[in-house]
């Protein structure tokens, strides 16, 4: 049966659940072509869900199991190790993609930290059961991830969810859904789609109508002062970077999907341990910084400093061992040619000044680390 392009895009939301397990990589300061920080892939949660009857959350959990019945065959057919998930879903449009990323950040900033943490932990567990040539998680973990994401989405006002949907649709070539569907059993894809629609209705029943207030942001703290110093020293370097380049979408040389997944898992664990208010503040700082980005993809000096301060506070809220797990995992997956290549594209004096300032900032953050 022929589906409209828009309906086919909705079908991709089923795949999004597993894509979160296998493909999503988030960094603290990525280019406009990547999803921003932990906030982009995070979705949202709500106080309203916490105060609702226990059966409220169970209804989403039960619906997730039914979705699993309808979609797991489809999930097993998707090649989650395919490099296609690194590509733009159509014409490369960095600044347009950034608008979609911004909507994701806004949605993520509405998250209840407890539900966000639960979703991250569900993803971590699901990564542990990934197996087979296609890199699919177990059926039980598939259900648990979908349930966690359903609760997260239910905690966000519908308009925020639709903002993400609409903005992603604008940068997605209309031929993409049909192509992706051609890679799996059409019948299984249709069954998954119908299951997703039923799941969507259950989630929508519990959806909140308003988002929580903004995060609290410290002022005059040592990390904030150090972030200002870092930003002043590194802003010339920042302005020399080509943020609109497609290099950020290139796969790491010689690194398999499974190797990348191990590094991604360390990031998810770190995100799950971070302070919820600090994460929210970092997402809000990124959102504001996106608003001041110029035609070259560079944010204002003030917003750059605010983002650095926010990220410093996030990192300080996580044990050093967890941060080093991320560092070591990424170092092991990064060929030595990559830093040299990136270094060659900017003024080396400015790059060295930025690095020196970063090490000083790192020491201040570490001193505040729990």
Curated annotation (Swiss-Prot):
<dbReference type="InterPro" id="IPR003376">
    <property type="entry name" value="Peridinin-chlorophyll-bd_prot"/>
</dbReference>
<feature type="site" description="Chlorophyll a binding">
    <location>
        <position position="286"/>
    </location>
</feature>
<comment type="subunit">
    <text>Homotrimer.</text>
</comment>
<keyword id="KW-0934">Plastid</keyword>
<protein>
    <recommendedName>
        <fullName>Peridinin-chlorophyll a-binding protein 1, chloroplastic</fullName>
    </recommendedName>
</protein>
<feature type="site" description="Chlorophyll a binding">
    <location>
        <position position="123"/>
    </location>
</feature>
<feature type="repeat" description="1">
    <location>
        <begin position="58"/>
        <end position="220"/>
    </location>
</feature>
<dbReference type="GO" id="GO:0030076">
    <property type="term" value="C:light-harvesting complex"/>
</dbReference>
<feature type="repeat" description="2">
    <location>
        <begin position="221"/>
        <end position="370"/>
    </location>
</feature>
<keyword id="KW-0157">Chromophore</keyword>
<dbReference type="InterPro" id="IPR036550">
    <property type="entry name" value="Peridinin-chlorophyll-bd_sf"/>
</dbReference>
<keyword id="KW-0150">Chloroplast</keyword>
<keyword id="KW-0148">Chlorophyll</keyword>
<keyword id="KW-0809">Transit peptide</keyword>
<keyword id="KW-0677">Repeat</keyword>
<dbReference type="GO" id="GO:0009507">
    <property type="term" value="C:chloroplast"/>
</dbReference>
<keyword id="KW-0437">Light-harvesting polypeptide</keyword>
<dbReference type="GO" id="GO:0016168">
    <property type="term" value="F:chlorophyll binding"/>
</dbReference>
<feature type="transit peptide" description="Chloroplast">
    <location>
        <begin position="1"/>
        <end position="57"/>
    </location>
</feature>
<dbReference type="Pfam" id="PF02429">
    <property type="entry name" value="PCP"/>
</dbReference>
<comment type="function">
    <text>Water-soluble antenna for capture of solar energy in the blue-green range. Peridinin is an asymmetric carotenoid.</text>
</comment>
